[in-house]
Amino acid sequence: GMTERKVIQVAEKQNRDYFYIDTGYMGNLHKRKDFHRVVKNNVQHMKPRYDLPDDRFKQIPLSMSSIRFRGWRRADGPILVVTPSAKPCNFYNIDRDTWVEETLSEIKKYTDREIIIRDKGLRRERVGDFSVPMQLVNDNIHCVVTYNSIAATEAISTGVPAVALAPGAADELCTKTIAEVESPYYPDEEK
């Protein structure tokens, strides 16, 4: 995981290929993690690979209805800020409290909406009825703001737009600036 930052830095300094394995971007809403990501020379995939066959990817929502995209929800509720956990903060050398303070201040420049803060918490506090997708629906969330969390991918797959402030796997489907929090990006549903 991200705790191997020093090993990754050595590999990069020596121009060695490495593979990073961590929790997958979707389908992990229960106690058991069914999906993982394997990334070459990075900790996240940065761009979709349209050159690869999509047959396996298309089979996933057929077997797991919880991750089937059902269209965009256009809710008029609060903004959900999903804070980065200690691992990405350490890896990217950011201070979580400073990030939260600056992010909230920036959001308030562009909206009067209520802001709900969600910290990562223990795994048992993040699955089932307590998962991000459940909160998005139950709290009628307008938009998610996060650093580079899997929460951006979960939001999009639930039909809620996301603002992801650092590079990550959901970049092609996210707004990248808080200034657009009131009118976030709703990509074409075919993407």
Regions from the language model: what does each represent?
Residues 5-6, 146-191:
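Charged, low-complexity C-terminal accessory regions
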Residues 8-12, 93-94, 156-158:
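Short amphipathic alpha-helical segments
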Residues 69-124:
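Conserved catalytic-core segment of nucleotide-activated headgroup transferases in glycan assembly
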Residues 2-4, 24-27, 84-88, 121-124, ...:
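Short, solvent-exposed loop/turn segments at secondary-structure junctions
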Residues 1, 9-12, 17-24, 80-82, ...:
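A structural signal for short, well-ordered beta-strand segments and their strand-loop junctions
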Residues 30-76, 172-191:
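Leloir-type glycosyltransferase catalytic cores
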Residues 1-43, 131-135, 151-152:
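Active-site and donor-binding regions of nucleotide-sugar-utilizing enzymes
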Residues 108, 113-167:
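Donor nucleotide-activated moiety binding/catalytic core segment of transferases
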